[in-house]
Swiss-Prot record:
Organism name: Saccharomyces paradoxus
Protein name: Leucine--tRNA ligase, mitochondrial
Family the entry assigns: Belongs to the class-I aminoacyl-tRNA synthetase family.
GO biological process, one term: mitochondrial translation
SUPFAM superfamilies the record matches: Anticodon-binding domain of a subclass of class I aminoacyl-tRNA synthetases, Nucleotidylyl transferase, ValRS/IleRS/LeuRS editing domain
Amino acid sequence: MLPRPSSRFLSTQRGPGRAVKKLIAIGEKWKQKTTRGPPKQGTLNNRSKYILCQFPYPSGVLHIGHLRVYVISDSLNRFYKQRGYNVIHPMGWDAFGLPAENAAIERGINPAIWTRDNIAKMKQQMESMLANFDWDREVTTCDPEYYKFTQWIFLKLFENGLAYRKEAEINWDPVDKTVLANEQVDAQGRSWRSGAIVEKKQLKQWFLGITKFAPKLRKHLNQLKDWPSNVKQMQKNWIGESIGAELVFKVADSKFENLIVFTTRPETLFAVQYVALALDHPIVQKYSEVIPDLKEFLQKSDQLPSDTKEGFRLPDIKAVNPLTKEELPIFAAPYVISSYGTAPSAVMGCPGHDSRDFEFWQQNCPGEHIKTCIAPFFDDASKTSEKERQKIIDTVPFTSADGILTKESGEYSGVFTAVARKSIMGKLHSKGLSKNIIRYRIRDWLISRQRYWGTPIPIIHCDNCGPVPVPESDLPVKLPELKGLDTKGNPLSTIDEFVNVACPSCGSPAKRETDTMDTFIDSSWYYFRFLDPKNTSKPFDREIASEHMPVDIYIGGVEHAILHLLYSRFIAKFLGSINAWDDPTGIFEPFRKLVTQGMVQGKTYVDPDSGKFLTPDELTFVKDPSDGNTTIIKSNGKIPMVSYEKMSKSKHNGADPNECILRHGADATRAHILFQSPIADALNWDESKIVGIERWLQKVLCLTKNILGLEKNLAISKDYKTPTDLNDAEVKFHNDFQRFLKSITESFEVHLSLNTVISDYMKLTNLLESALKKSEVRKEMMVQNLQKLVTIIYPAVPSISEEAAELISSQMEWNQYRWPEVERTTESKFKKFQIVVNGRVKFMYTADKDFLKSGRDAVIETLLKLPEGRMYLMNKKIKKFVMKYNVISFLFHK
């Protein structure tokens, strides 16, 4: 009889009963060891593995989304350590930024104090979830020891002509009173943080020349094989590569130089009807000084929707088509992207062959004729009817890039578009009126912020010398300490002792730059600093960075696809270009494999009548025998509408991970969040389903006690190998175990399918439990495979693994952290043979799989010794006898 399972580990559904409290206590018992102690880093051929999750902003509270990222990261960290890698798994704090500054204003304190308090709270929360980080590598971006080197990177950019200051139209957040980069304004024209409608202003600002790296940023995306395709596509779209031509349109007014107009379709020149200029184009700016209506149009342009087709026709000025010599009207048009490429932005308008140009022409020149110069081409094999053909021909605009030029195209009439494009470019090029070019939509990175809580820009403005870089020996330029902040905006400009300095170049009185840097600069290089965090002379050692970069696995949200990830790629490539690190591939990409986890969504309850989002206090949760739990609205007795949506305070659907850990324990919470959904998918958070995880964890502990209780003095060597003389049950047990072990190992190493890891853990536990009940597998094999189970659950549920390992270690010596190798599956030495008499199976006989090789006489003799053999075979005259595969067939004379 099997030992009775300990009642301490029996499941309960009534709150945190004794068994669940035991799980919680186990997490507390092993917290110190699992977060700070073993396993030691391996020495597997000195291979390293750099696993990094995006470091958080220290708000003071970890939400479920944080928990998901850190559990994924920590599980991979533990797995690779068990596999023998020297794992780098650091954590730090993205500590500068508006939230800290705004919170400090509300509380009347220095943001540094608020930030430090929050970091302490969040470190405790990370430990409560048993996260094992390399705290000796911890960095905080608001520490002068860190931002000293953020300033050093800025100076290197400045030295290489990639940091510059110019007056530009900028995005102004009227709530937070600061400048926003283009990437920080959403499609509705709102600030990414405050949600305010963004205004346009002209200010002198600092920019970083990311556009110089646009070709490499675009090209190298194709080499990032382990990045999600949607992230790469978003970056491709943002970089916006356009292969086209710059055409010279002369201006029929000698006061202005020629217009450089960009187009991707020079074959449409015969149908061009206007030229559109960006609002910051020099011609537009010049005319705005003398035309009040244009000035007013420019001032109100920031209030127009992003897809506006409004335009302002410039009077008394025409552009000359370089091919047809026709004079064309010129418009100021908000849809033209400012500074599109190297030349001021100008595009040609072709209403007959471009949908946007068509809408613009209809709005600004209603009723005027629309020209076309390209028609669709139908070959003889086309099955398109004449009626359908005419309908296509009459459709305006005709936007296909493939077609045939019409009679309006003069000498090019009847020529295919691709041929005409090449010929037209050659003709214009011979006259000095065109050149092939690749342009990019991306614009230089605006980094100036008019706020206090950020990295000071290390520049001094001198009337004699202009912008002068702060000498490296004077870094860091420290933020002056403030007792408290009482207003939004930039307080640095009001602090005389900070602003007024001597020029480092000529010694004259000068003023320090009072803008601080965009916080995305801080996070654009932190993965380098983690590798050498105590270095006081440089950001990081070149050899150390070259050895461990790029990051092997980088985990974080897809919401950073354009901002953080693009900026990090730019800075990594720049640092490579100045020989700060070496990449044998030559592409200097910072992240080899990118893992973007799905959003965690909360259960949302809505009143079907009013549409109101309901709080838990407004609901009654009752048990329904027919279909489980039912939720009822207290006020009207109705059943609410239920859905899963992004967690928010307004929808009352948030979840506190700390409360979940307090109710169920860290291990159950970790396994639950891994089990609920594949990493890339949205996770619908439902805490009620965690009971299945709790039962499994209790089963693991109970199973450990029961297997060890088979024989008190049972002990096996730590070098114990799977026996070769396995019976059928042992063969099946061994093969099933190896199949699950292989699946789990590959789920970590190859597929990153951590939800199936938890599922396979459960199946392995059930496999051991079933074998224990049947008593068909020898005790030594049971213990050996129990050890393996306890070892491989360590990445996901470390304290349960430690608890079970402690029970095992009390009876025998073993290496509880070394990941087991997958063994070959085996075949049974025995085979079941069908004994067929006159065409019918009479009985089965199990024998050595080589039984038939003993020969006819030996086989018959053996079978006749069996009771069934004597019954069906004795005293019969054999007419025909066949032995084949697993069949022994007798045909007797009647």
